Amino acid sequence: MNNVFVYCEIDKFTVEEVSYELLTKGRKLANELGVQLEAIAAGNGITGKVEKEILSYGVDKLHVFDAEGLYPYTSNPHTSILVNLFKQEQPQICLMGATVIGRDLGPRVSSSLTSGLTADCTALEIGDYDDKKSGKHYDGLLYQIRPAFGGNIVATIVNPDHRPQMATVRSGVMKAEKVAEDYNGEVIYEDVAKFVPDTDYVVKVIERQVEKADNNLKGAPIIVAGGYGVGSKEGFDLLRKLAAELHGEVGASRAAVDAGYCEHALQIGQTGVTVRPKVYIACGISGAIQHVAGMKESGIVISINTDPEAPINQIADYVITGSVEEVVPKFIKYYKENSK
């Protein structure tokens, strides 16, 4: 009762990385609240394939739902699992990834339980809250932190009166860290029929087409990112050449995306992707806090900027003062001459 729950998203027999990130955060939240961490795994044929890995993130109790109709994912069965399990277990917090599945499942569950949900969170904390209108004081609420108004402000949202406190969290904003390979958690193999009525299986997935992503920003060891200072689409072509030489990926600031220099899929920051490369080369990026929030955990940051006072230089390990057009071709030339 009143524990922290994490819904683990599973693609066939593979637990998605965002779920491990949430288990890590869930463990920390549970420790702070003095409660247990529980996880939910639902799929087809997953018994014996996912339990040990999930438990290793510090899960005290894992609820496994294994049935033919639970994979590929469809809305109704998974909604019924969470709604009925939560009515039984009464969790105080539920976390899931801000993925295609999480954005479908989360609102359905929160609506059924009239609990409310904060979507696309970038941080989660535990804290107190004083309701000035009612005069009530609340201990140990979940601070659900997310960008608002196009990323221009950061909002902290609380849910004092309804449970569970639900949030979806963007992939990559939290680190996944195991507690112990042999963590001694309990596994409960649930009777799916008790939670899911037969009518929920009316929709079946006949065929799935999975398209390969155009980039791998989240997993790239080297990222060459461009900002408004790159100046044009042609400037981004230059960054792509450098990224290709370094076997890295190209990213962008919101200003560059808004200017039409590149596509939104490359955007890094609070309203884009969060990355942790070994090397981050910031080209013509001023360093707005919204952008820095998405790359601040990079290993080495190299800033190329005409403005020596640019905010990005405050967090950079190396600063090169100059234009992208002047500096990047020298990078490419030097690498070609010295990488053989």
Feature map (PLM): residue ranges:
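N-terminal glycine-rich FAD/FM-binding segment characteristic of electron-transfer flavoproteins
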Residues: 1-340
